[in-house]
C-alpha cells in the first residue's frame, strides 16, 4: 500500500511541477519584455558614464547629456522644452534616454540610425550644446583623468569617434527592466490586477497596439500625427518641428510624420508628444483616441488603459523609476 501511495504522491508532485512550469511560461504577445542589460566593456561603460555627465561637451561648459536626460526623472527632464547652452528653450520635447538603444531610429524625425550619430549631432547642434568636435577633443585631452580613461578603453586615446562610441556604449546599458508588465509577459500572470489586464485588452482592442508594439512598445516605425483628424490645425501656432520627416525628405507624404515613441515608463515622462502639448497621461490618451484612432471610448475604458500604461514603468539601478 505504501508503495502505491508513494507512487501516486510522486505522480502528483510531478504533475504539480509540470503545471507550475506551464503557468510560468512566457506569454506569446505582440509586446515583448526587455532584454537583459548587455554586458559591455566596463572601461568604455564607465568612461561613457563620465562623459554623459560632462558639461565640457558643450561650448560654454554649462550643459551635459544628463542636464536634459536626467536618470532620476524618467530619462528626460519633465520640461516642455529643454534649455540649450545659451539659456533658450529648444523647439522639441526631449525624449527619454532610457531604452533608446532599442529604437530603430533616433530623434523624433528619425534623422539618424545610431546612438553614435545622435551624440555627434547633439554636441554640434546650434541650439543644444553648440560646440564642435575639435574643441571637445582638445578640452578632454587636456585633462589627465580623461587621458588615462581613454587610453584604458581605446588604443588611440581621445578622438571624436571614441567619445561618441563611449557615450553610445553607456547608453546601451540604460535599460529599465522588471516592469510589472514585463513580469506578466514572462509568465507571472498574477502580478497585474484585473483592471490592468482589462486595460491591456482595451489597448489591443482599440488598435493602440498597431503602432505601439515590440520590445520597446513603440520606437520601431514612423507614423503620421493626425491620421484621423488635423491635429495641427486644431492646436494652432505652427512650429517648424511639426513638419517631422518632411524636414529631411521634402516629401509631402512625410509631412507631420514622426517616429512612434516608446511607451515604456510613459507614466513618468510627462509632458507628451514632440510639442509637449499634453501635460498629463490622460490628455495624451484623449489626443491619441481623437486624432490617431478616430474613436470615442468610454471614460471607463480610458481609465483602464491608463492603469495598464502605468504597469510599463521599469527599474533603474534596482529601484522603480
PLM features: residue spans?
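Periplasmic c-type cytochrome electron-transfer domains
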Residues: 2-5, 22-321
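Bacterial N-terminal signal peptides
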Residues: 10-21
